[in-house]
Swiss-Prot record:
PROSITE patterns noted in UniProt: RIBOSOMAL_S15
Pfam families (UniProt xref): Ribosomal_S15
Name of the protein in its database record: Small ribosomal subunit protein uS15
Stated role: One of the primary rRNA binding proteins, it binds directly to 16S rRNA where it helps nucleate assembly of the platform of the 30S subunit by binding and bridging several RNA helices of the 16S rRNA. Forms an intersubunit bridge (bridge B4) with the 23S rRNA of the 50S subunit in the ribosome.
GO cellular component: cytosolic small ribosomal subunit
SS bond partners: none
Gene source species: Allorhizobium ampelinum (strain ATCC BAA-846 / DSM 112012 / S4) (Agrobacterium vitis (strain S4))
Alphabetical GO biological process terms: translation
Amino acid sequence: MSITAERKSALIKEYATNEGDTGSPEVQVAILTERITNLTEHFKGHKKDNHSRRGLLTLVSTRRSLLDYLKKKDEGRYSKLIASLGIRR
């Protein structure tokens, strides 16, 4: 259930702050959110897949760290990002 290259480039284009920006927190959080959504759908059919569940927890933790960093640096960008991604915080 990996993210396709087309979907990843679309997310980068949508959330990038500059042209060719792949490292900003907004882009990283958007990609992580897409991966988390895919894994969540995977678990609806594979309830006992504990190895992937550990990976999901790692992704959620990484996303939380990036969101905390963004909130500390720029509250406006943080609010805009969680509203556009539909993340509840």
